[in-house]
Design a protein with these regions (language model features):
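A structural signal for short hydrophobic beta-strand segments in well-ordered beta-sheet cores
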Residues: 139-142
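Residue-level signal for inorganic ion chemistry
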Residues: 9, 20, 74, 103, ...
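A short, Trp-centered hydrophobic/proline-enriched beta-strand micro-motif
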Residues: 117-127
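Internal helix-loop-helix
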Residues: 48-108, 112, 116-117, 154-161, ...
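A short core secondary-structure module
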Residues: 124, 149-190
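Glycine-rich beta->alpha junctions and the first turn(s) of the following alpha-helix
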Residues: 2-8, 12, 80, 189-285
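C-terminal helix-coil-helix/basic helical segment that borders enzyme active sites and/or dimer interfaces
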Residues: 27-35, 253, 257-264, 280-306
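Short secondary-structure junction/hinge motifs that connect adjacent elements
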Residues: 27-49
């Protein structure tokens, strides 16, 4: 079984890498991290112009009509550049949830806005510490009205809309959870940015006060849909991490070749060689696993949750 990417995918990778090298150098990333802006707006517009935000969105809804393999390619380059934009929350989570469960009206309203960079989306799942589970979701939905708090919500302080997991039953089963789509700008939602260990990923607390919401998908199937979205997002985040690991390895190699000690590059010392070799093996293993995940994601294989 061949998990390698095609020549077309590699061409897409080269285009994405060139674009991000020009528009998202380390200096630009540092400007966002050290400044007051929560993301790079110019880069976000540029990604939309390149078609990267809508690469997995069908052409019917304003996207490129490609697929998840192409999105994996873009994800790796986003991680390599440490791009300070709400890409994962909007593309991996919100857009995928709408594609999976949204009505035709919801798809026609939000997907073109995502592809054009006019809308930022997120998934409001967590309600404090701990792993996500149906039991951990307590925010109630009554008559499509939400009241409660979600935190942390990735990029919640800058999001235009959110996919919200809420409780619609009390049986103690997974079927107690349903998904809702909330237009944050329409009112009924207070967003407060949270202090985060990783400044490249904004987190927020969203407070819903008699907030009107639209059901996203059938009532009682929210947890099943969330699980599918998270499984796919895990693969895409893995590609971002592989991209970052590869770039770190390249930087370490270059430093080892340039740094002189005792009259020769430190890369010539056996201890440094061993360190770089171990890094390479770890990065290659991660890449292999990610490629397997990309295959599972693109074919909807049963192995995906694993």
């Amino acid at each position: 079984m061949n998990f390698d990417f095609s020549d077309e995918h590699k061409q897409l990778r080269d285009e994405a890498r060139k674009f991000l090298a020009e528009k998202c150098p380390p200096k630009a990333v540092r400007t966002v991290l050290d400044g007051k802006s929560s993301y790079d707006r110019d880069l976000w517009k540029g990604l939309a112009g390149m078609g990267f935000l809508g690469v997995a969105i069908p052409e019917t809804y304003g996207g490129a009509g490609a697929g998840h393999l192409e999105l994996c390619v873009i994800a790796e380059e986003m991680g390599r550049a440490l791009a300070p934009v709400p890409f994962s929350s909007t593309v991996y989570l919100a857009a995928e949830a709408i594609l999976l469960a949204g009505s035709e009206a919801q798809k026609r309203k939000w997907l073109p806005l995502i592809a054009s960079g006019e809308a930022i989306g997120t998934l409001a799942l967590f309600e404090g510490k701990g792993n996500p589970s149906p039991q951990a979701i307590r925010l109630p939905a009554s008559g499509n009205i939400l009241n409660g708090v979600k935190k942390p919500v990735p990029d919640g302080a800058i999001a235009d809309f959110a996919i919200v997991a809420a409780r619609t039953g009390s049986t103690g089963r997974d079927s107690d959870i349903s998904l809702f789509l909330v237009d944050i700008k329409a009112g009924g939602v207070d967003a407060k940015a949270l202090t985060n260990v990783d400044p490249s990923r904004g987190q927020a607390e969203l407070t819903f006060k008699n907030c009107k919401a639209e059901p996203l998908g059938p009532v009682g199937e929210g947890w099943s849909m969330v699980s599918q979205v998270l499984d796919g997002a895990a693969v895409l985040i893995a590609f971002e991490q592989v991209g970052g690991a590869d770039r770190a390895l390249e930087m370490g190699r270059d430093y080892a070749l340039d740094r002189i000690a005792f009259g020769r590059p430190i890369g010539s010392f056996q201890a440094v060689k061993h360190m770089l070799a171990d890094m390479y093996v770890s990065a290659t293993l991660a890449r292999s696993n990610s490629y397997y995940g990309a295959w599972a994601l693109s074919t909807s294989a049963s192995e995906l949750p694993e």
